[in-house]
Curated annotation (Swiss-Prot):
This protein's name: Casein kinase I isoform gamma-1
Protein's job: Serine/threonine-protein kinase. Casein kinases are operationally defined by their preferential utilization of acidic proteins such as caseins as substrates. It can phosphorylate a large number of proteins. Participates in Wnt signaling. Regulates fast synaptic transmission mediated by glutamate. Phosphorylates CLSPN.
PANTHER family: CASEIN KINASE-RELATED
Subunit structure, interactors included: Monomer.
UniProt PTM: Autophosphorylated.
InterPro entries: Casein_kinase-1_gamma_C, CK1_Ser-Thr_kinase, Kinase-like_dom_sf, Prot_kinase_dom, Protein_kinase_ATP_BS, Ser/Thr_kinase_AS
Matching SUPFAM superfamilies: Protein kinase-like (PK-like)
Top class in the EC scheme: transferase
Example of a GO biological process term: endocytosis
UniProt organism field: Bos taurus
UniProt-annotated location(s): Cytoplasm
């Protein structure tokens, strides 16, 4: 009489583990039975290499190709979800444009959304530090010519960028054929300026909430005007002068409140004549700023005219476009020391969220900057998420000490997050790659066997 009961118990004991295994195999992302966190079928999540308002940035590895990747994790229950929108913009941009990171995967990972992207090199801000915070005219022109093409491509896909700053422009990884290419990253603040339904330009509006980084944003953005293509180009012009001068006249302003300081930045920017800003530099720099500031809200910029301004100046100076940037030949810091570069190659808030003057508690990244630079503060109204997946702007805007006014509560990941127990789990390194725990920049790695690279023409 007891045999049927024993057989039933035995079936229950054997079928339960099998059901659990089927559940695990059908799960697209999450922790495996060995405790390894996976994103999608083939991306293994490793140590934490950065964090920001969006959540965490993790080092990852493609188990099929042994290539390292960057993985952004955002809580699914975030009050201001951002990652899927950024992924959609990357898909809208496509893979045809030069200087855009590859996006490998987007999907759930336990309690988080995850986006897997190409791992790139250091940012222009990192390299600016390396070059004693001044770039030569040749380097700035090589950067400017490339970034005008990047922005033209972004605009051709019906997007405006709205987040110009040196931290968002990265070179490729050392030893990679794209190491000389300036990449544009982080489309968390981008916006469609062509209505996808009507195919018409968005209307001109005023009293808009501020979007961008105060140091570089256009004058019209300070005035609360809706941004369009012209504002991206003006912000680029301010960044070019930052590289040439080493600083901008509206840095380091004093005020009692963040709101007043932000107002002072805009006032100083408006009251600084272009001739003064560009004094002692080629006239083409002033011509560029005059042109972009005179553009109409709806007007399509003449990108070729602006590029020709710089290419003609480049040729008149007798420069060769050999990608011999100022940082070439300098030891570039990596997570495992320095790599000597072969001389042969080389935010704010969305409109739907209210602005709150609450500074971020994130530390400044660069601990070696001068005390004067550390003492400078700018208001950087918060974006929904701090969406850089590679390097510098995971923390507050460095050197200038920009304060992020946070309007979302994403914060860091909870202590009980599924990756927390495995953040230090080693990733089996390729023979040529080493990874250490304390990484100043998460975008590049020291190669043990130095590969010779040819100069890119």
């Amino acid at each position: 009489m007891d045999h049927p009961s024993r057989e039933k118990d035995e079936r229950q004991r054997t079928t339960k583990p099998m059901a659990q295994r089927r559940e695990h195999c059908s799960r697209p992302s999450g922790s495996t039975s060995s405790g390894v966190l996976m994103v999608g079928p083939n991306f293994r999540v490793g140590k934490k290499i950065g964090c920001g308002n969006f959540g965490e940035l993790r080092l990852g590895k493609n188990l099929y190709t042994n290539e390292y990747v960057a993985i952004k994790l955002e809580p699914i229950k975030s009050r201001a979800p951002q990652l899927h929108l950024e992924y959609r913009f990357y898909k809208q941009l496509g893979s045809a444009g030069e200087g855009l990171p590859q996006v490998y995967y987007f999907g759930p990972c336990g309690k988080y959304n995850a986006m897997v992207l190409e791992l790139l090199g250091p940012s222009l801000e990192d390299l600016f530090d390396l070059c004693d915070r001044t770039f030569t005219l040749k380097t700035v022109l090589m950067i400017a010519i490339q970034l005008l093409s990047r922005m033209e491509y972004v605009h051709s896909k019906n997007l405006i960028y709205r987040d110009v700053k040196p931290e968002n422009f990265l070179i490729g990884r050392q030893g990679n054929k794209k190491e000389h290419v300036i990449h544009i990253i982080d489309f968390g603040l981008a916006k469609e300026y062509i209505d996808p339904e009507t195919k018409k330009h968005i209307p001109y509006r005023e009293h808009k909430s501020l979007t961008g980084t105060a140091r570089y944003m256009s004058i019209n953005t300070h005035l609360g005007k809706e941004q369009s293509r012209r504002d991206d180009l003006e912000a680029l012009g301010h960044m070019f002068m930052y590289f040439l001068r080493g600083s901008l006249p509206w840095q380091g302003l004093k005020a009692d409140t963040l709101k007043e300081r932000y107002q002072k930045i805009g006032d100083t920017k408006r009251n600084t004549p272009i001739e003064v800003l560009c004094e002692n530099f080629p006239e083409e720099m002033a011509t560029y700023l005059r042109y972009v500031r005179r553009l109409d809200f709806f007007e399509k910029p003449d990108y070729e005219y602006l590029r020709t301004l710089f290419t003609d100046l480049f040729e008149r100076k007798g420069y060769t476009f050999d990608y011999a940037y100022d940082w070439v030949g300098r030891p570039i810091p990596t997570p495992v020391g320095s790599v000597h570069v072969d001389s042969g190659a080389s935010a704010i808030t969305r409109e739907s969220h209210t602005h709150r003057d609450r500074p971020s508690q994130q530390p400044l990244r660069n601990q070696t900057a001068s005390s004067e630079r550390r003492g400078e503060w700018e208001i950087q109204p918060s974006r929904q998420t701090n969406t850089s997946y590679l390097t510098s702007h995971l923390a507050a805007d460095r050197h200038g000490g920009s304060v992020q006014v946070v309007s979302s509560t994403n914060g860091e990941l909870n202590v009980d997050d599924p990756t927390g127990a495995h953040s230090n789990a080693p990733i089996t390194a390729h023979a040529e790659v080493e990874v250490v725990e304390e990484a100043k920049c998460c975008c590049f790695f020291k190669r043990k066997r130095k590969k010779t690279t040819q100069r890119h023409k």
